[in-house]
């Protein structure tokens, strides 16, 4: 383990966080709020940590997969701890475990909250919650690759450790250029949504917060009734479209920008992703039609909720916990499917589901025709055995974490639906679950042990499991010989 480079990278991350903490501080100045000292103190802590860890650049800047995974896991943990300080210092969330839950939920783009009254927060804290979504959506380490001049080829380990999905492809020969392209697309879509929301009459502050939350597929909002507060079909439709857009693999946007339209529209995962959205929305629309005035209105709300859940954003226009069992079951299924690999969404990812389906089909064909030689393909290309192996290992690890978390949560929760969906929604970074943790409820009733488990699940789900698991593996901490 190259501890020097890990230390140096964490220091840079703290420096970046101190800059982001100035945004809510400025908001507190604009609105004349008392929370200003809390954000300035947190920014000072972060900057001091950066100065302490970055005072000396390491001589050996080489790092590999192990350093990449450890750096990512530690960065996100420290990021959340520092980010929780303003809530505690301001007294808006007095207990640290609750503040940590809220901040981890923000940075991991989960959107689950312990707050019963979001509207009681200051403007500064509202902005900070949504800003954590935007920062966590693409990943602070990916952003750091833009500003930090490290040895070129090795930065792929950072991006692979933090990016959602089975693999990370280069859009440019240099990973720094790839990170810049990703953030340019990310920033551009965020600004575009903000403009469209303003055109629809949404207040500027709300448009900023909603756009940041949508971009990160997070789901934090400024109102207790989420997007239903605005009571505008136009605004809800704009948010629906952008939730779907942010759930698409960003490589497709790069292909479109470089005029490779045919190649972009041939991506199998995107076709499956869009197909699932509209099929599930149609099924739910027919199922909930008696609850609404027309099929058009039922499809409007069904499409919004399907897009919100599959992209793991977590916004809501209605209390879908009151929907029929069939519709709720479909929404829970969408929690596990998730968005596309290479997007800001969570879940298992459509690409993994697609490849697992192809693997099952391959095995069935081999049983029928034992001598038949078949290979799994994606987008016309053969999928390497290593990728299929990593997907199988991921699913096993995912099932293990899910079952263990469910058992621990059930020690202090008697409602099985609440237990199951609380783990499902945090491990998949969705936000709202069903029953006691539904869209109109919160996670504040869970005891500290359960909150700790859910915090781990949110981090593990966001970082694709293995970076967090490696922290508990003794061999990870051995020095390089």
Predicted region positions:
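Membrane-proximal intracellular helices of multi-pass ion channels
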Residues: 1-481
